[in-house]
Amino acid sequence: MELYIITGASKGLGQAIALQALEKGHEVHALSRTKTDVSHKKLTQHQIDLINLEEAEQQFETLLSSIDSDRYSGITLINNAGMVTPIKRAGEASLDELQRHYQLNLTAPVLLSQLFTKRFASYSGKKTVVNITSGAAKNPYKGWSAYCSSKAGLDMFTRTFGFEQEDEELPVNMISFSPGVMDTEMQAVIRSSSKKDFHHIERFRKLNETGSLRSPDFIAGTLLSLLEKGTENGRIYDIKEFL
């Protein structure tokens, strides 16, 4: 049995990963701002606001200290929580909007990954961290200066972390995984923005109208299959590789 720790697990991709991991017989710690009505004997829900970094650090350390690692053949952290807003051109977002965005999309996953690595330094089982990224990490979009740059930063953290872990006797394996366009609440937020703020809005509206958005269940299954087969440390994976 393995243990999965998943952020942003109350909806969308995070919830799909959690439910499928439970179906496979694994235990899940689900982190989100709001708890869901999902009940399972192997599911533990934690109400954590990752934008509040100091509080999140304390709560996550408490969670990690409660884990008996000897019970698991592998432990995986999936940094899934994120936001696309502010959808605005550079120069138009407020300080508060930028702080919230980068704290959730970049600083929080870096912080949680560090805490995870320290806590399980002597653990000899399989240790994995997955950072959910986006094609926006490589491709600029007008109106997504914050989102593109935060995901690009997260990908470089993945690459650097993997490079550093080559020096470790019991390394943590970290990857980034780009799920592509999914039928989630984030896509609804994108479609509700304006042409002025987001130049590519019509493309994303068309993806929805033509049924081209992939389901979170499909993406979750693909990711879990990849993790079962094994991954290359520091690599950026894209869903397009598995279609």
From Swiss-Prot:
Biological process, per Gene Ontology:
tetrahydrobiopterin biosynthetic process
GO cellular component entries: cytoplasm
Gene3D superfamilies for this protein = NAD(P)-binding Rossmann-like Domain
**Which positions are catalytic residues?**
147 (proton acceptor)
Main localisation: cytoplasm
Q: What class of enzyme is it?
A: oxidoreductase
A Pfam family this chain is assigned to: adh_short
Q: Does the keyword Oxidoreductase apply?
A: yes
Catalytic reaction list:
(S)-benzoin + NADP(+) = benzil + NADPH + H(+)
Q: GO molecular function, one example? A: sepiapterin reductase (NADP+) activity
What UniProt keywords apply to this chain's record, in alphabetical order?
Cytoplasm, NADP, Oxidoreductase
UniProt-annotated location(s): Cytoplasm
| NCBIfam families recorded | PRK06924.1
Q: What does this protein do?
A: Reduces benzil stereospecifically to (S)-benzoin.
- What family classification does the UniProt entry report for this protein? Belongs to the short-chain dehydrogenases/reductases (SDR) family.
Q: What is this protein called?
A: Benzil reductase ((S)-benzoin forming)
Q: Which organism is it from?
A: Bacillus subtilis (strain 168)
Q: What is the lineage of its organism?
A: Bacteria, Bacillati, Bacillota, Bacilli, Bacillales
Question: Gene for this protein?
Answer: yueD
